[in-house]
From Swiss-Prot:
GO terms for biological process: cellular response to oxidative stress. One of its GO terms (cellular component) is cytosol. InterPro entries: Fe_traffick_prot_YggX (IPR007457), Fe_traffick_prot_YggX_sf (IPR036766). SUPFAM superfamilies: YggX-like. One of its GO terms (molecular function) is iron ion binding. This is Probable Fe(2+)-trafficking protein. Belongs to the Fe(2+)-trafficking protein family. Could be a mediator in iron transactions between iron acquisition and iron-requiring processes, such as synthesis and/or repair of Fe-S clusters in biosynthetic enzymes. It comes from Chromohalobacter salexigens (strain ATCC BAA-138 / DSM 3043 / CIP 106854 / NCIMB 13768 / 1H11). Keywords: Iron. It comes from the Bacteria.
Length: 90
C-alpha cells in the first residue's frame, strides 16, 4: 500500500490509512480512496452521533444509519450532526 492516497473527500493526495478500517471489500475501498485525515474526522463525527443519539451498534438499523452517514460525510454531502455539540475552543 502506498503512503498516500487520492482522498475522495478532500480531492487531493493525503496520507493513506495503514490498514482497511472495515472488513471485506468496503474496507479495501475505503483504504484506497479515503485519507487518514478524512477517516479520523469521520470517526470523531461517528462517536458524537453514537453518543448523542444513543445508538447501539448491536442494532442493525443503527449500523445502517452510520454507514449511510459515513458515505454522506466522505462524499461531502450534508450529514446529521450531534444536537447540542459545541466544538472545543482552540
Amino acid at each position: 500500500m502506498s503512503d498516500t492516497v487520492f482522498c475522495r473527500k478532500y480531492q487531493k493526495e493525503l496520507d493513506a490509512l495503514p490498514f482497511p478500517p472495515l472488513p471485506g471489500a468496503k474496507g479495501q475501498e475505503i483504504q484506497q480512496t479515503v485519507s487518514k485525515q478524512a477517516w479520523d474526522e469521520w470517526q470523531a463525527l461517528q462517536t458524537r452521533l453514537i453518543n448523542e443519539k444513543h445508538l447501539s451498534l448491536l442494532d442493525p438499523d443503527a449500523r445502517a444509519y452510520l454507514m449511510e452517514q459515513m458515505e454522506r460525510f466522505l462524499d461531502n454531502r450534508e450529514t446529521d450532526q450531534a444536537e447540542g455539540y459545541v466544538p472545543p475552543s482552540q
